[in-house]
Amino acid sequence: MAAVRDYKTALEFAKSLPRLDGLSVQELMDSKTRGGLTYNDFLVLPGLVDFPSSEVSLQTKLTRNITLNTPFVSSPMDTVTESEMAIFMALLGGIGFIHHNCTPEDQADMVRRVKNYENGFINNPIVISPTTTVGEAKSMKERFGFSGFPVTEDGKRNGKLMGIVTSRDIQFVEDNSLLVQDVMTKNPVTGAQGITLSEGNEILKKIKKGKLLIVDDNGNLVSMLSRTDLMKNQNYPLASKSATTKQLLCGAAIGTIDADKERLRLLVEAGLDVVILDSSQGNSIFQLNMIKWIKETFPDLEIIAGNVATREQAANLIAAGADGLRIGMGSGSICITQEVMACGRPQGTAVYNVCEFANQFGIPCMADGGVQNIGHITKALALGSSTVMMGGMLAGTTESPGEYFYQDGKRLKAYRGMGSIDAMQKTGTKGNASTSRYFSESDSVLVAQGVSGAVVDKGSIKKFIPYLYNGLQHSCQDIGYKSLTLLKENVQSGKVRFEFRTASAQLEGGVHNLHSYEKRLHN
């Protein structure tokens, strides 16, 4: 029998062993040995915990030039992301991509609503003239979702300031034919052109008013600050904002047909920060040409291309000028592409291989599809992705489009794949986002690559996203790293270890041997 070692030498002995426990990511994702893997097929091994989870930074790259405070992204699906979802995704540190299964004008209006929701200096405030009627002002309040319109002499943005119309000025005015010059607040408190954002916020605190109008030396309106935005800055410290305008970041999706060029012009005019080229198979001449056109026409606009599942697909899009990649083909909960088209790839393997290639060129990648819980998010990030796109996880939330309905006593919302027949027939086939996404514009018989269904009410993302955020912090803590950057660096160096899971191991890792139980995700 071998002699028992001195316990004081345990660390030295562990270091002397020929290999670390578990597998490196390269060994785990060897397709020749294990085939294609997805998130349930492996675990990340625990490391040393020497810090509180609250110290974990989840800051990450969305594209070459856009950084987010969280890796959470909402999918451009017509049952997931419209303006309300995009607003709160940005407030909570992520970003939302508004779907394009609607008219270009409607999509641009949704982008505009996000950009106007929270601003630092509002450099293009909506203004009215003294001869605007009270009824028109009320209609504008309903249309734009806010009140507080500066009144200028000529009704133009840089005109001489005459006053401001707020809710309290018009709320109880019954005669809608009255002119705003008769009810507006005259001589409002103003700030001088050139003051800083912090100085403007201090003035707002002192005057206890809702808006601060910024004017030049001649009394002409220059910009505006909002008190509600000051409050939001306190409530949402992680909010994703433009470094220049301080507006919330907003993304949107377009297709790759010629009509999408005019759609994109409207979106850029509305303030779009980043565009996703929405295609189930991104390695197409249509997408390559669209990337080149966008780079020539809107050189400052960030482009996320895809979807891709292989290095070869990624190489074409990177060479064309993509600023980010979207990974996934057939792995979404409502997607049947792999079943119908016999084309796709298990998501874990797709994420690892594409990220390993793209990261060498500084191109951030987004894992899209197959994510069902916090553990899956952690694994996608460990495999190299910078962000994680969620569709099914956010469907059924308060902020997702659609009305709730009841079935068998449960409160539900509709959720459908963009490759479903329902989505393809939402508008005319020409210009429809779904037919464009699946190259089906000219088909007389539509072949579905998705299904329509319903999901249970999940409540508001104002509670759900913080749950994901805290859970991901705890996950990084268990693995032993204080940031996503450190996690990924140590995965690549081989210090972070993995374990392949058999089917029995997967059963063991879930709830088992209970007569009944309740699974509550958060309080």
Curated annotation (Swiss-Prot):
Protein activity control: Mycophenolic acid (MPA) is a non-competitive inhibitor that prevents formation of the closed enzyme conformation by binding to the same site as the amobile flap. In contrast, mizoribine monophosphate (MZP) is a competitive inhibitor that induces the closed conformation. MPA is a potent inhibitor of mammalian IMPDHs but a poor inhibitor of the bacterial enzymes. MZP is a more potent inhibitor of bacterial IMPDH.
**Pathway where this protein functions:** Purine metabolism; XMP biosynthesis via de novo pathway; XMP from IMP: step 1/1
Gene Ontology MF term list = identical protein binding; IMP dehydrogenase activity; metal ion binding; mRNA binding; nucleotide binding
Task: Look up the record and name the cofactor or cofactors this protein needs.
Answer: K(+)
Q: Which domain of life is it from?
A: Eukaryota
Binding sites annotated in the UniProt record for K(+): G330, G332, C335, E508, G509, G510
Quaternary data: Homotetramer. Seems to be able to form heterotetramers composed from more than 1 of the 3 IMPDH gene products (IMD2-4).
- Role summary: Catalyzes the conversion of inosine 5'-phosphate (IMP) to xanthosine 5'-phosphate (XMP), the first committed and rate-limiting step in the de novo synthesis of guanine nucleotides, and therefore plays an important role in the regulation of cell growth.
Q: What protein name does the entry list?
A: Inosine-5'-monophosphate dehydrogenase 3
Which lineage?
Eukaryota, Fungi, Dikarya, Ascomycota, Saccharomycotina
